UniProtKB/Swiss-Prot annotation:
Cofactor(s) required for function per UniProt: Mn(2+)
Hydrolase listed as a keyword: yes
Protein name: Adenine deaminase
Catalytic activity field: adenine + H2O + H(+) = hypoxanthine + NH4(+)
Family per similarity comment: Belongs to the metallo-dependent hydrolases superfamily. Adenine deaminase family.
Entry-linked PANTHER family: ADENINE DEAMINASE (PTHR11113:SF2), N-ACETYLGLUCOSAMINE-6-PHOSPHATE DEACETYLASE (PTHR11113)
Species the sequence originates in: Ruegeria pomeroyi (strain ATCC 700808 / DSM 15171 / DSS-3) (Silicibacter pomeroyi)
Pfam family membership, one: Amidohydro_1
């Protein structure tokens, strides 16, 4: 199936005018509901919405003049009629699903518009992979806009990727029909220091009249932040506290507050609106990263809106942050984000504005979900063989590949350790004294919960393995977890307490072509196969979610108590978020953007 383009307002304006005037019948009327008007922040009972050609023709107390013998009537029975929800920043690949299966998972939760940055697949398959994601996105019955990835690699010189994105790639992508802008500009030091490549990508986007996505993962809100904003990024989702949110909107950016599977950054920032009283127009809700189990079991943007309301936000303001604010940011407020004439007929019916049960979802004028069940097909792209079989280790790994040699004669060593922080993307730079046995540094039964982490190169079959230490997972016994989802270079991350288990896990992923696996005492406890680029599955969302849930349970069985620890695991190689990360080139201190030694001399 080929990508399709939705007819423009101008294309169908004659029909909309005729329906609104009562000269022609509507295709559908939603009758007698409470109209949530996000333009005026009002709840207006006793209204009806008339729809034609997939767009809204009329909204008013009585739409009977728009009705004809073939008009479909949907009785709202006083329920709230709210705009379809928009996710302002997200990565489809984090759901472990292709765009089609991701859409099928989130449509029943009321998401009808997504702004997605496929920079995960860009690191593995380059521009060709981005085009595949873009094309499948355009095939869906809801609105999926693609942001062209900006940073592959995310930090040049500190990691290697399967492919690199160039300014020429960005300029080419700006001509594609579904490209809405530039994906998050993660190389914030590059922008601050006026790196010609980064500024060229931003310039190509701005000259195309499109939006530049931001990513400023630094606590420094002084001149470095000012320089970043001056470079052109228009939004940022990396804030973690109220001061971050306020600084961004004061400088003319949109503050995107995220609630993903493991990122809980709404509660700490939304006080800028609920307590400080800042104008909410420049605040947007998003998910960033949600894995499939969260999507299927907990929800998507409806979950984020509910959470914002639970944090004290007025329900109508929370809805604005997930509809009109998002659409306006991307220059689409005349196209979507509200239930007003001319806009795409993306409408949700719900009986409660706080708990937000999603009872009926209409997208582009057709019923796409009802009572939690998808009601339309989400067409699949024919993924080529080049998108599969992307795990190339060079040789089968053994326990020896994961050994860390101690300095000659040492009985103990001091190590730099990556410290995981629950529910947040940043890590802590920790230090730990570790024992040495037979010349090798050991972590077994360490009182500070230190275990081993390895970054296994998988794009060029170099056989390279970078070893380091991580703390915070709470793993116990002889176990290992391996994943080819390893933001953003997407090599393979292996975390474990035992080198033999680490080798078993890594080799298993090479065997199945990518995914996530957990091993204990020589047995595989869970496996999520992700054959497309080692990032996604084209299996049904419910099947992938069940395997993802089994993965979460297996991590808990191995002693992990972190909320959605898989997401923490997948970000340990993201060398643009402080403080410590691992890459195929070594241990990276993101505060200084330098490689540092794993081991230090004992005082």
């Amino acid at each position: 199936m080929e990508p399709t383009t939705f007819p423009s307002w101008a294309d169908v304006a004659p029909r909309l005018v005729a329906v609104a005037a009562g000269r022609e019948p509507a295709d559908m009327i939603i009758r007698n509901g409470t109209w949530i008007n996000v333009h005026t922040r009002e709840a207006l009972p006793g209204h009806s919405i008339a729809i034609a050609e997939g767009r809204i023709a009329f909204v008013g107390p009585d739409a009977s003049h728009c009705s004809g013998p073939d008009t479909r009537i949907i009785e709202a029975n006083g329920r709230y009629m709210i705009p379809g929800l928009c996710d302002g920043h997200m990565h489809i690949e984090s759901g472990m699903l292709t765009p089609a299966e991701f859409a099928a998972a989130v449509i029943p939760h009321g998401t009808t518009t997504m702004f997605t940055d496929p920079h995960e697949i860009a690191n593995v398959l380059g521009l060709a992979g981005v085009r595949m994601m873009h094309d499948e996105a355009l095939m869906q019955p809801v609105n999926i806009f693609t942001q062209m990835p900006s940073c592959a690699p995310s930090a040049p010189g500190l990691e290697t990727t399967g492919y690199e994105i160039t300014p020429e790639d960005v300029a080419e992508a700006m001509t594609w029909p579904g490209i809405i802008g530039l994906g998050e500009m993660m190389n914030f030091p590059g922008v601050t220091n006026a790196d010609p490549k980064m500024l060229a990508e931003i310039a190509a986007t701005q000259r195309a009249g499109k939006t530049v996505g931001g990513h400023y993962a630094s606590p420094d809100l002084g001149p470095a932040f000012a320089a970043y904003v001056a470079g052109g990024p228009a939004d940022d989702h990396e804030g973690t506290c109220e001061a971050d949110a306020i600084a961004r909107v004061r400088q003319g950016m949109r503050s995107m507050m995220r609630l993903g599977s493991a990122w809980y950054d709404v509660e700490t920032q939304i006080t800028a609106v609920t307590e400080k009283g800042l104008d909410p127009r420049n605040f947007i809700l998003c998910t960033d990263d949600c894995h499939s189990a969260t999507l299927v079991n907990d929800g998507h943007m409806n979950r984020v809106v509910r959470h914002a309301i639970a944090c004290g936000c007025d329900p109508l303001i929370a809805l604005q942050m997930a509809t009109i604010n998002t659409a306006t940011h991307f220059g689409l407020e005349r196209e979507l984000g509200s239930t007003a004439p001319g806009r795409r007929a993306d409408v949700i019916l719900t009986s409660d504005l706080r708990d937000l049960p999603i009872e009926l979802v209409i997208a582009r004028g057709q019923v796409v979900a009802e009572n939690g069940k998808i009601a339309v097909d989400c067409p699949h792209y024919d993924w080529p063989d080049t998108a599969r079989g992307t795990v190339h280790l060079g040789h089968a790994l053994s326990a020896r590949d994961f050994e860390i040699a101690a300095p000659t004669g040492a009985n103990r060593v001091r190590a730099n350790v990556i410290g995981v922080v629950e529910n947040q993307a940043p890590t802590k730079a920790l230090k730990a004294e570790l024992p040495v046995r037979e010349g090798l540094v050991e972590t077994a039964e360490h009182p500070d919960d230190v275990c081993q982490i390895a970054l296994v190169e998988r794009h060029r079959a170099t056989g390279g393995v970078t070893n380091a230490f991580v703390s915070g997972f709470g793993y116990q016994g002889r176990m290992a977890m391996a994943s080819t989802v390893a933001h953003d270079s997407h090599h393979m991350i292996v975390v474990g307490t035992d080198r033999e288990q680490m080798a078993l896990a890594a080799n298993r992923l090479a065997e199945v072509g990518g995914g996530i696996t957990i091993w204990r005492d020589g047995q595989e406890l869970a496996l999520v196969e992700l054959p497309i680029a080692g990032l996604m599955s084209d299996s049904p969302a419910a099947e992938v979610a069940a395997k993802a849930q089994a993965m979460v349970e297996a991590m808990a069985a191995c002693g992990c108590t972190l909320n959605n620890a898989y997401m923490q695991h997948s970000l340990l190689a993201l060398v643009v978020i402080p403080e410590l990360r691992i890459s195929d080139l070594g241990l990276i201190d993101v505060r200084s953007f330098e490689r540092i030694d794993l081991l230090e001399p004992l005082a």
